[in-house]
C-alpha cells in the first residue's frame, strides 16, 4: 500500500515522503497513530503545497535574520552595569541582559536564545559575542561593558 508520511518515521522515511509499505503495517500501525495517510493525488498536492509554504517561510525568516544581523553589526553596543573600583561587575551580564539592553538601543525585538555566551560577563571591558539567529544566520558582534555612573 502506498502511504504519505505525515511525520518522520524511523527506518521508513521523513515527513511528506511517499512510501510503499505492507497493508497491515499501514492499517494497523501508521494510519491509526497519525504517522501516515493512504496515498491520493489530492493529498500529494496538498503536501507539496505545504512544503512550498514551509520553504518560503524559512526563506523569509532567513532574510529577516540577515537584516537584523546587519543592523546589529553597524556599531559597538554599550551596556552599562554597576561595578566596583576594580572593574568587577555586581552581578553579571547574561544573554538575557544583552537581549534586553540591545533591544532598547536598536528598537529591534531580540531573543536571549540568540546570544551565545560561554559564561556570563563579570568584568568591565570589550567583548565579542556570537549571535545565532533563526535561519542559520550567525556572526559575532562587539559589545562594550562600561561602569554605570
UniProtKB/Swiss-Prot annotation:
One of its GO terms (biological process) is translation. GO terms for molecular function: rRNA binding; structural constituent of ribosome. InterPro entries: Ribosomal_bL9 (IPR000244), Ribosomal_bL9/RNase_H1_N (IPR009027), Ribosomal_bL9_bac/chp (IPR020594), Ribosomal_bL9_C (IPR020069), Ribosomal_bL9_C_sf (IPR036791), Ribosomal_bL9_N (IPR020070), Ribosomal_bL9_N_sf (IPR036935). Keywords: Ribonucleoprotein, Ribosomal protein, RNA-binding, rRNA-binding. Belongs to the bacterial ribosomal protein bL9 family. It comes from the Bacteria. PANTHER family: 50S RIBOSOMAL PROTEIN L9. The keyword Phosphoprotein does not apply. One of its GO terms (cellular component) is ribonucleoprotein complex. This is Large ribosomal subunit protein bL9. Binds to the 23S rRNA. The keyword Ribosomal protein applies. HAMAP family: Ribosomal_bL9.
Amino acid at each position: 500500500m502506498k502511504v504519505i508520511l505525515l511525520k518522520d518515521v524511523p527506518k521508513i522515511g521523513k515527513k511528506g515522503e511517499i512510501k510503499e509499505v505492507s497493508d497491515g503495517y499501514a492499517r494497523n500501525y501508521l494510519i491509526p497513530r497519525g504517522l501516515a495517510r493512504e496515498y491520493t493525488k489530492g493529498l500529494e498536492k496538498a503536501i507539496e503545497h505545504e512544503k512550498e509554504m514551509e520553504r518560503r517561510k524559512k526563506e523569509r525568516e532567513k532574510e529577516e535574520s540577515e537584516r537584523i544581523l546587519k543592523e546589529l553589526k553597524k556599531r559597538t553596543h554599550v551596556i552599562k552595569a554597576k561595578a566596583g573600583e576594580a572593574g568587577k561587575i555586581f552581578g553579571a551580564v547574561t544573554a538575557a541582559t544583552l537581549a534586553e539592553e540591545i533591544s532598547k538601543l536598536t528598537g529591534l525585538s531580540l531573543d536571549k536564545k540568540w546570544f551565545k555566551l560561554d559564561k556570563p560577563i563579570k568584568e568591565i571591558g570589550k567583548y565579542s559575542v556570537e549571535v545565532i539567529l533563526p535561519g542559520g544566520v550567525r556572526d559575532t558582534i562587539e559589545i562594550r561593558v562600561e561602569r554605570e555612573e
